[in-house]
Structure formats: structure tokens, C-alpha cells
Amino acid sequence: MKKKVIITILFCIAVLSIFYVYKSQTSRHMIDKVSKELPIVFSAEFENGDKGTFKYDISSEKYEKISDFIFYELSYSEDHNSIIGSVSEDEFQGIAELNMKDNTFTPIISLSDLNACAKELGLDEIKYSGPGSTSIHMPKYYKDGYTFSWELWRNIICYLTKENDTWHMEVLHRYNGRNYSYFIKEENSEEVIFLETSEEIFKRKLEKGVDRALDDSDLELVLKIPKMEFIDLDGIMEMSDDKSKLVYYKEPEIYIYDLESKKKEHVINQFLFFQHILDLKFSYDEKYLFYTVADVPYMWDDIKQLHFFIVDLESKEKIELTKWKRWDIFYGIDW
């Protein structure tokens, strides 16, 4: 009897060892493939006091500072040669970009110039209250200009262009409730905006030069999504570059939803135990999906301990990368 128990234990140890070796080799192989992708970029303030914007190397799980400025809710340009973000520091307030080749910081427009444009549209002025917060949200490159959300509720989306050294700003969209994220697509010679709210993803056609105030009658429901008890301020919805697919989470699964076929594809299970998913990002070639899982903060404050994950969208293999420290605070991530 004793001999059988020993044999059983040894067998279990052998099986677990083989499984561990297999998982390690699989993870290493996947990391080798993913390391050829463009770097993940994020802005953060770390527990040790270091802060700014950083490039994250997937293979080594190390990061390199590329700017002392925090780029809030940053996003890559279409060619990934630069990033754009909101900056709120004593040295500069407004929208700026960072060249990813030589790390050159370039102001795009100051907060004072933005406020001058906003005043012409009858929008409330944004006041600088010091480093660490901003009311200019989700800035993105778009066509020959830039888009962004104005003020806390993010329900006013603006389009900014410059002609003959003069800035021009128009309101593309207003929404009655709170808005979390948005994407704009050119569809059949028209512009369509996709909006993530607390429980739905909508789309609507945009009419250049037309501000329909708070008229939501022409919003078209794309997808019902689970109501989040806790949601990242810039949302978690992600869309492919051609805006034909979107990624969303419905516990315990991450899905890719095809807007043309209206079919969903299961990506992977991610069970959450006192946790929330805060970011979903395609890789540049859309072969992989990066996402973050945050431990529920103590007393529901704004401090969230993040875990980084990457999924191979073909094999559906998943690897966990860095588990960050409790007081490492992230302000924007893109891939």
C-alpha cells in the first residue's frame, strides 16, 4: 500500500514537471515571437518616484524612459512613428506628441489656445489645477488634425485642425450620458463614430459642421456590453485599424466581434476574482492582443495593481508578463 502511494506521488510529480517544462517552453517560444512586435508604450508614476512615458520590452519585461512628461491617455499614430497625449505639467499644458525614433517632445497646442477655440464654440473653459490631472481626454490623430474629448464626462468630442497658423475646432459629437472611448471610421464616403458607454456600444453618422447638441435619436446600437461596476476612465473597447472588428470583455471571456458578419469569436477565458480588465490593445499587425488586469483597489480608490497579459490570436496561447507594484500608477497604454 505504501509503495503504491509513493508511486502515485512520483507519477504526479513527473506529470507536473512535464507540464511545467511544456508551459515554460511554450511561453518562451511565444515571447520570442511577440518580441519582434513594436514596443508597448505607457505613461506611469512608479512607487519609487520615477515618472514619465516609457517603452516596454516584452522579451525582457524591462522598460526604458523616453520622456519625463506623462502623456495621459496616449495613443500611437497610424504608422506608430509617434504618440499623442494630453500633458498637464507646470512646464506645459495641452496636447503634445512624442517622436518614437528620437524621443523628441513637440507641443501641438497649448491649453490656452484650446480654451480660446472652446470659447468660440460655447464650451466651458478648462482650468489647469496642477500636475496629475487633465480634462482633455483620449487625444488621437485623425486625418489632417486631431480629435479628443472635452471635460470630465468625455461626452463632447472635438476635431482640431490648423490652417494658415490658425487653429479651427468643431464639435463632432455630443452625448447625453457619460462616454468612455470612441473610434472614428470612414464608411461609404461617410464618417461614423463608435462610442463606448457604460452598458452599450453605439455608432452614429457624423455630418461635418453639424453640432446636434444632445440629440441621441440617431444612435444605432452595435452591441450590448455588461455593465461594469468599475471601469477605466478611457474605456476598454478596442477596434481593429480598419474598424471592422471590436474587442470586448464579457466575464469570463474576451471576444472579437465582427461588425460585418455580426458574429463573435472567442479569444480566451480570463476569470476575475476581485479584479477588472482595464485595457485591450491589438498589436500593430493585429496578430496579438494585449490586456491588463487590475486587482480591485482598497476601498475603491484610484490605485490599481496591474498585471500585463498577451494572447496569440491564432493559437489562443496566453502569457502573463509583469505584475506591477501596488503603487505603480498608469495613465495611458498603447501597443
In which residue ranges do the predicted regions lie?
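Sequence signature of WD/YWTD-type beta-propeller architectures
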Residues: 11-335
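N-terminal Sec-pathway targeting helices
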Residues: 1-14
